[in-house]
Design a protein with these regions (language model features):
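Short loop/turn segments at secondary-structure transitions that flank enzyme active sites
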Residues: 130, 196, 223-225
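Short conserved micro-motifs at the rims of enzyme active sites and ligand-binding pockets
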Residues: 135-136, 201, 227-229
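Short, acidic, Ser/Thr-enriched surface-loop or helix-capping motifs
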Residues: 206-207, 227
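Conserved catalytic alpha/beta cores of large enzymes that bind or transform nucleotide phosphates
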Residues: 214-305
């Protein structure tokens, strides 16, 4: 298999060296699926080749170059907004090539067979596909779509990921850094949706102090997006790497949470009164998560956030 000429790759076909093909998020998910026993919700990713194929076959390249030529002053906020919006609109207005749509639809159907669920709910996320450009140069704030169901909806969200390559922020960054907008590419991760009672993030180093003796866990009720976005104040748990025990905890009040809606998409709901000041994770769950964090850090050989 020539990975560089495939429209998509399954997680077990990817590894950390595939950043240029499927981006940072996708390659890390592939690495953990194929090289570790850490549980990872299953899925696949579209490739940089698929993105460039879409841009080329749709004739978007020339349209985008013409629009970008009008961006004569990147410090002109109104002009930047206008150009960026027109670039996104141009992408969304084009039909994805039939063979690419068919490949995504077939992979989604195969995903359903593999997990034993017809038309499963998935998350669709963008993944930057170049090692020398940070995520800020690619995707916008809205580059994650949760609780998506059905092939047509997934194809539409993949296109929205492509369009997120041209947020005002992303265009400004690339202009200031001298990067070619047409040379960027984006991968979209299509991953089984986890309907979590609680979710959050973990760090194997305290980024504020540099202390790497503990695992730091932040968790809140509902889906993890509210933790990442800072919408809620999560619980904080500190686990000693050496002793494998919880050495500190801070349980914070949580009034709202993000949860899935039946049929697709998500909604904000109030946290039940009885749970608002309750510890989000059990001690057993905290220690299990810390164990995974240590495994991932050992595998990569560097500090990790996840």
């Amino acid at each position: 298999m020539n990975k560089e000429k495939e429209f998509l790759l399954w997680f077990e076909q990817m590894e950390r060296g595939d950043v240029a093909i499927v981006g940072g998020k996708s390659s890390s998910l592939g690495e953990m699926t194929s090289k570790t026993d850490v549980p990872v919700p299953y899925g696949f990713a579209t490739t940089a080749y698929a993105y460039r194929y879409f841009i080329e076959k749709s004739g978007l390249k020339e349209k985008m170059q013409a629009i970008l030529a009008e961006l004569t002053d990147v410090e002109n906020s109104a002009l930047l907004r206008d150009v960026s919006a027109r670039l996104r609109e141009a992408i969304m207005a084009e039909e994805m090539p039939e063979d690419l749509k068919a490949a995504i639809a077939a992979a989604y159907e195969e995903l359903g067979k593999k997990v034993g669920e017809a038309e499963p709910y998935v998350a669709v996320r963008s993944s930057a596909t170049a090692e020398d450009l940070p995520d800020a140069s690619f995707a916008g704030q809205q580059d994650t779509y949760l609780n998506v169901k059905g092939a047509e909806n997934i194809i539409a969200k993949v296109k929205e990921c492509y369009a997120s390559c041209f947020t005002d922020r992303a265009v400004y960054y690339r202009e200031k850094q001298g990067f070619d907008h047409i040379e960027v590419a984006l991968s979209a991760v299509i991953q089984m949706m986890v309907f979590s009672k609680a979710a959050g993030v973990m760090f194997t180093v305290n980024v504020a102090t540099g202390d790497d003796s503990n695992i730091l866990i932040e968790a809140a009720f509902g889906l993890g997006e509210y933790v990442v976005q800072g919408t809620v104040t999560p619980d904080n748990y500190t686990v000693s790497k050496a002793e494998n025990k919880i050495v500190d905890r801070c349980v914070n009040e949580q009034d709202v949470m993000l949860v899935r809606k039946e049929g697709g998409d998500c909604e904000e709901l109030p946290v039940p009164e009885a749970e608002r000041n309750v510890q989000t994770l059990t001690d057993e769950q905290i220690l299990e998560l810390a164990g995974y964090a240590k495994k991932i850090e050992a595998h990569y050989g560097c500090y990790m956030d996840m």
